[in-house]
Amino acid sequence: MKTGDKITITVLTDKHKAEFTAPCLVDFEAENIYNIPLTLKGFKDNADKFGFKETVLPAITSFGFKVDGNKGKLLNNKLVWNSSNNPEFNNVTEYTATIKGSTISHIIPYLYDFKLKPTFTVSKGSKVYVGEVEQKSGETEVDFTRPVTYTVKSGDVEHDYTVSITNTGLPVVVIQQSQSGDFKEVTTGGLWGIGAKTVNKFVDFMVRGKDTEWVEDDQMTIYNADGTVDLATANCGVRLRGNTSQAYPKKPLAVKFKDKQAVLGMPKHKRWVLLANWLDHSMIRNSVAFDLAHLIEQAWKNNASIGEGIPWNVHGQNVELVIDGHHVGNYYLCEQIKIGSKRLDINDAYEDVKADGLVEATLENCGYLLELDNNYDENYKFITSHYSVPFMFKDDVLDDGIFNQVKSKIQGIEDNIYNGNFTAAYNDLDINSVVDQWFIWELTMNHEFLDPRSVYYFMNGNGKLCAGPVWDFDRATFQNVTNAKNQGSSGDRLKPYDEWICWSANPKSGLTSSNLDNGTSCIFYPALIKDPIFQAKVKERWAVMYPVLMGLEQTIRAYGKSQAVSFLFDSAMWPTNKAAIQKHKNNFSDWSGDENINSYPELIENFVTVYRNRLNGMNTLITSGRFTK
């Protein structure tokens, strides 16, 4: 380019296009880069000389989606937490996107059908195109699975916009309840009905109570984050679940399919659970705890010399839940703990053996899933004599002989532990699974094995009593001790990183169903932890598992990315500040210590730090041989 040559320059901004022509004042040399400072004012002030022309670019001035124009795809309501610390649904008629420069974006958290008809306005005299197809506001359907380029044209001037309509990046579960079954109110609390709380009312619609008969004409569909179908619409029954948690405003649900279904890559089964995680500000405590259990399983499977541990633990995935046309936030969809070839693979439960009618049910050919829980609310149950541990059969055992044989075996184990005959106890108690379960409870800082609550054991025929699977980690686990103390936690609700939780146990003998809460047995662990055989087994298994468990930090950070967008919506719908929680759970003081962290990256860093501190604290306790105070 030589002196005197004409240079035509075009300058584009978000809203304007400027063009002018100027002469070259110097010779440009090849293979050189020239930086030329440019101020438009001088050219604009001498428009005739330089042929300066400024054009206002055609623009999209508003962009959104009307609910009526996208029926069956967009919900007409939004869950909000009001100033009275109660959830409510507000009416929604339109979703309005954000326009920033040449980018238009909006997040619809539950979106699973990306073919939508947008409503938009443009600058006067402009037309809008996607490719070569002219777009009509409120009429033209567009697939927003991927970002779409909208071109606005006015004469020979055009302006491109990139439109991104996304969800949270999680699968979307859609449930539609039928009208069949029992929706009558289930109440708790109050005095003579005054002040009672309806536990099966979900904000402003009803779900069936946990003890109602299953129906088979509810429907569930599951969509992947990209809108593809993971589970085509399947018949099922949905009802409330949980003990304490059923009274929380964000309702946990149980699902039973009419036919076995594979869900999100998990094996086919009829029984599934949707955990609400209302008290878990991070939304991932259950996810991380089950991942921890799987790492422990992986460790012993890769090191046969230390022996087998818990053979199966729950799998699941965080999802967005839509039920009866309401988006209710982030849930953990997971396998329910059940006996079966794809779950806890032991002999069939007594009821199933009897129902099959192929053989006579005996102690040896039945499997027994046992829950240890102070709620003590199953049909077949007993309390041990020395430590008052409540054992409940999850499946009815109608044969008194079999029931008494299982009870006698477990009581015999406790007798031997109580009398210091640990070798004899381990003839009937699987020490490997008991150690592994203890690792999980202690690492997650889960207070509930003290009571105990939601603790599972099992027996396969007349085999050993085994610990597991593990369950229920949403409340006050992975605790930031300092923050929890500042929130109001005290006593055994605080769990220092360098002490054993089971040191806080207060086992008592002779308790009954009416006063189980007077003691905290912590099952058999306060006695086991003093046994040299148990201590040696702990050290042996920990040496193999500790390096594997260090990798859990990466898993937590990965959740920090995958759950970040969902957190923005869920934390707004279900805040976990002190006032919000205590409005629905009087005098609650079992804090995790992250409830007031509003930045998800900071919350995840807190989670990682807490886990690292607890892992290191346990490593020091074990390697130094400190098992007693």
Describe the residue ranges of each PLM region.
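Internal "kinase-insert"/substrate-recognition segments embedded within catalytic cores
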Residues: 256-262, 267-283, 295-300, 312-314, ...
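Regulatory N- and C-terminal appendages and interdomain linkers associated
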Residues: 51-55, 61-72, 165-234, 554, ...
